[in-house]
Amino acid sequence: EWLEELFKDIGADVVVSGGQTMNPSTDDILNAVMATPAKTVFVLPNNKNIIMAAEQSINLAEGREVRVLQTKTIPQGISAMLMFDETADANENQMAMMEAAENVETAQVTFAARDSEIEGVPIKQGEIMGLCNGKIKYTGNDIKDIAYKSAVKVFKKNQSSIITVIYGADTTEADAEEVKNRLAEKCGDEVESSIVNGGQPIYYFIISVE
């Protein structure tokens, strides 16, 4: 999967696959920690539902110092990874990586795996959901429209300057281009926008705004 390759290309020693419906366990994370050659290991959960499992690995990893960064989305994880500096100490890296992550807003588009009610919003199985920084803000049937609305919701005028539309296995480059062009028109010429083939399952779009 492209996103796994990306994380490895920017310096990750081990990538544990996960997603909305298949979150890795503490054992999965612990095995990944022990598979790295480093004495100090940074764990980037990139999903709020994985943070607790990651934190449980801290006391179980013998001979390793484990630091769990509170990254809640894949774009936050990418920005944090790009700030890692091999010449800096662990504290400096942790501060720089978290500062980078906190500057990233994330819109995600997925579907409901079953009928449910989330934060008081009734959702039917198969319905499209737009998440803004992990919270459901939009539901409906039009994937591209929900992607656009969700990204606009997290865009900060006069602060945001880069929009990256990462499209998944069940979406096309043409769809991503259409979403990107609508966002570019809405957000203005000073914003740099691009599309990336993420190939990820479950999420039709993951949109990074920073």
Placement of each model-derived feature along the sequence:
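N-terminal loops that bind phosphate or other acidic moieties
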Residues: 1-210
